[in-house]
Amino acid sequence: LNPGGVRIGTAEIYRQVEKVPEVLESIAIGQDWDNDVRVVLFVKLREGLALTEALSQQIRNIIRSNTTPRHVPARIVQVDDIPRTISGKIVELAVRNMVHGQPVKNTDALANPEALAYFRDRDELKS
């Protein structure tokens, strides 16, 4: 990730999000936005939970207090699943390509390629 020209590792964000018990998994990408890049965090929550403004704020506060303001996502979006390779690694590039309307290569290497559909044409990412 490179918002405002500052290099940020996604692992720094994931380490903070792991502290939020409501979140099962997350994936962060850089979305091209307004001649820059903004951080977008997708979260898979525990069953039966919905992403509220309070939970979004809790996630942002944990990230901000343990990293830098640049690490704080501009958007947090709930998804039902996060795509992974057959070996279990989350696939940030595939999600980034879906968000940007670009083709995703090598979907045969994904354990759950159907999860990619959750990242296409999200209204939350159009403003």
Write out the residue ranges for each language-model feature.
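Adenylate-forming
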Residues: 1-18, 42-53, 67-75
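Positions that flank functional sites
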Residues: 16, 32-33
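Short acidic amphipathic segments
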Residues: 17-26
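Conserved C-terminal "lid"/linker of ANL adenylate-forming enzymes
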Residues: 25-32, 40-41, 60-127
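N-proximal, solvent-exposed segments at the start of the mature chain
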Residues: 36
